[in-house]
Every structure is written in C-alpha cells, then in structure tokens.
Amino acid sequence: MQYRKNQRVVDLQAIRENVRALKGAMGESVQVMAVVKADAYGHGMVKVARAALQAGATYFGVATPDEGIQLREDGIKAPILIFGALGKDGAEAAVRYELTQTVCRAEMIEWLYEECRLQGKEAFVHLKVDSGMGRIGVRTVEEAQSILNALKKCPGVKLTGAFTHFADADGEMEAFTLKQLKIFEDISRILPGSILRHAANSAATLRYPQTHFDMVRPGIAMYGCPPVKTVMPLRPAQRWVTEIVHVKKIESGDTVSYGRTFTSQHLMRVATIPVGYGDGYHRMLSNRGKVLVGGRLAPILGRVCMDQTMVDVTDIPEAVIGAEVVLLGRQGENEITPDQLGAWAGTISYEVLLAPTMRVPRSYEHEEYDQ
C-alpha cells in the first residue's frame, strides 16, 4: 500500500505511437530494435517491450545478460541483443536463453563455442565495430578478420549482425559522424552480405538516413524525448506526480530549507511536497527547478531535502493541501519535459528518467492494446 501520493505514470499508448512513428518513417525494409536497457529508461522493461512489439518493433537491445533473461522469462521471444561485452561467465546464459551476444575478441567466440558444445545449441553474435566511440569493438579490418577466422573454427557460433555506435550524432558538426560511418562501411565490406547491419541510435535515426542500413536502434526517442529537432510526432511517455501536503505563509526575511539559501523578500505562500532526493528528485534543482500546480509553474524554494521540497505557490490559489503536483509531464496547458527538468538540474533527459528510486512506484495507462 502507498501511504503518500508519489508515483510515475507510464503511458504505454505513447510508447506504441512513438514506435509506429519511427517505424513508419523508416519504411518496411528497415527493422526497429527497441532499446529497453536500464529498465526501459525507467519506464519498465517488460511492459514497454510488449507495447513495442505490438507497434512493430522486431528486435530488442539490452545492456546485460540479466536484462535479456528477464525478457525471456516474461515470455518475450523476439531476438535480443546484449550490447555489453561478453564475459566468460555470461556465455552459458547467452546460449541457454538464446540471447544474441556482442563480440569483439576471438576469445568471446571460443567461450560461446564451448557452451554450444555443452548445451547442444547454437549461439548468435553481432560484431561490434568501434568506429570512434572509444568503448568496445574492433577498430580495423584486420581485427574484424580475426573474428571471422575464429568463427570458422567454431561452427556452432553464427554471425548474424554487425553494428557500431555514434558518439556525436546529436552534435552540430556532422563530420565526425560521417567519419564513423565510413569506418563502419569499410569494415563491413569483409563481412557476409546476409547479416544485419545497424548503426543508428535515436539521433542518427532522425538526422542521418544513410545510417539506417537494415535496422535502427531508437532508445530515448522511443520514450518521446528526441535528442534532435524533428517533425516526427513523438511524445513523452512518463509523468511523475505527487501532491501538496502542507501550505503556509512566510513573511519577508523568513528563510526556507537547509543552509537558509532562500530568503523571502515579501509575504509568500509556500507549499511542501513529499518528494526529495531520496526519491531521485535531483538536489541540483534547489532554487532552480519548478513544478506544476494548477497548470502553472511553481519555483522550488531553497534546497531540495531528502524527503521533502518546498515551492512558491503565492500566485496559485488552486494550491491547497491534496492538490496534484506534477514534477515531470503535462498539467493543463503547461508541460515539464525530461529535457527541461534535465536542464534545470544540469544533466540530461536520460538521467532524469532513470533517477526515481524504489520509493516512487510505477503505474501504467493503456495497458490494453487498442489497434
């Protein structure tokens, strides 16, 4: 039972509509890999995966074997790619649960092959090309050839794809992205023609059609937060709501919260909400962020506490005890987007969506699929 109103509300219909919009812009020949790592960017991995499937996604991307296993155990049968580097201990699960594994070293192929022999099954892999991100992947044609050589010696391990990741597709200068694209294309030429090639993250999906290849990998865009300007009708899929638990008046000269960083210059009405950095509401929002009350923006006063935050409701008569407060999302004609909340907090929309802690339960709208 929840004894205070403080929850995230995920609109699964928004997820479906966003996936349809992305899929529709790509055309029938380009698949959509729904990136659902990190609990679907804080939206709930399994429910989002089901909604994405309903809307036309055909593949899933996760970061770890544990995430892939969770999808399998909840009945997701579509291909799942693990983006992270394979460790020897992860080979058993990759084969057992039929998870496609990213590879970039010959020893990874050998680990999977050993598990194929033990389990009497095949393993599937995608080759990662480090074209400029600087994380994992082969960097040269020679390194890619070493992977192909290892695959020839391990017939149970099947190469089904190759991919790269752009470091700055949302940046103003396109030269580096195009350089990465050329590196990927050069290495791809020695790979079998039948495999899936994919490179486009959300930004590249929206800005660089030449990067679409056989499949695109929308992550943040699927959740309604496009990282670049677009005419595509993408809408945020999550709201974070709470309520006012106390209202008081303060006089000129009164201070608010720890460190007394806010001092009133006049008579004010101040509301307290039961949310703080212990819930994942960024402390950097202190004296900077705003919430929505009665459809209007109410500035945060003083420091965000661990469990409570105070806001200025002087000019908002609807601000009474029990009134809804929106930390993220729309209320009336106004909206606080993940990008806006991130800007106030000095961070990015991704972190905003992932920030809420276990004290902030999640509920869902439009779970029923309405075609």
What are these regions (language model features)?
Residues 1-16, 67, 86, 93, ...:
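Active-site anion/phosphate-binding pocket segments in diverse small-molecule metabolic enzymes
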